[in-house]
Amino acid sequence: MNFLLSKLLLGLIRFYQYCISPLIPPRCRYTPTCSQYAVEAVKKYGAFKGGRLAIKRIARCHPLGGHGHDPVP
């Protein structure tokens, strides 16, 4: 089940990266970008923990939040 959810999440993230992201200006304050971080987190930890890490990272990515290099733990 986790495998299928991981594949679904990765597909949605890749769709965003290739179809939506090129249409909007870059604004991620971190490296790797939030979408790449999400891919790495889901691949490393699976859909549930990786998805939770990705959501927490996206929530931190705003002008008053942090910035810089923030790899997947």
Curated annotation (Swiss-Prot):
<dbReference type="InterPro" id="IPR002696">
    <property type="entry name" value="Membr_insert_effic_factor_YidD"/>
</dbReference>
<protein>
    <recommendedName>
        <fullName>Putative membrane protein insertion efficiency factor</fullName>
    </recommendedName>
</protein>
<keyword id="KW-1003">Cell membrane</keyword>
<keyword id="KW-0997">Cell inner membrane</keyword>
<keyword id="KW-0472">Membrane</keyword>
<comment type="similarity">
    <text>Belongs to the UPF0161 family.</text>
</comment>
<comment type="function">
    <text>Could be involved in insertion of integral membrane proteins into the membrane.</text>
</comment>
<dbReference type="Pfam" id="PF01809">
    <property type="entry name" value="YidD"/>
</dbReference>
<dbReference type="GO" id="GO:0005886">
    <property type="term" value="C:plasma membrane"/>
</dbReference>
